[in-house]
Amino acid sequence: MTYQSQLTELRGMIEKIEYYKYTTDALIYWDKITYMPRNAIEYRSKVMSFLAGEQYRLLSDSRFQKLIRFFNGNAQNVFVTNAMIRRLIRNSESIRAVPEAEYQKYVELIAVSEQVWAEAKEKNDFSCFR
């Protein structure tokens, strides 16, 4: 495969990762501005956990890792490509340091605790966080 075809493949993979991230962020934002019903939090947190799992699998995919290694320090890279690769290495290493199931549970916990925090703040009662 040529340099350009591999770069195109990598960009396609990054695009998918960004779609999942954007969807997760949009879901959180939409729920905030529409004041999502209290009992909908469980479903939302499961959706967010699923999206996080998909992101995790893409970032830790063996082909994705192979492409990152190929571009890391490649003499044909322009400045922007080098910066992109540095960020991808940092992101993929940090996410792969945590097992996938644990990462998904973490995202689910964050989704639930965000709403609990908002309610606790409104009532000025943070005992539920002890």
Describe every region a protein language model picked out.
Residues 2-130:
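A well-structured
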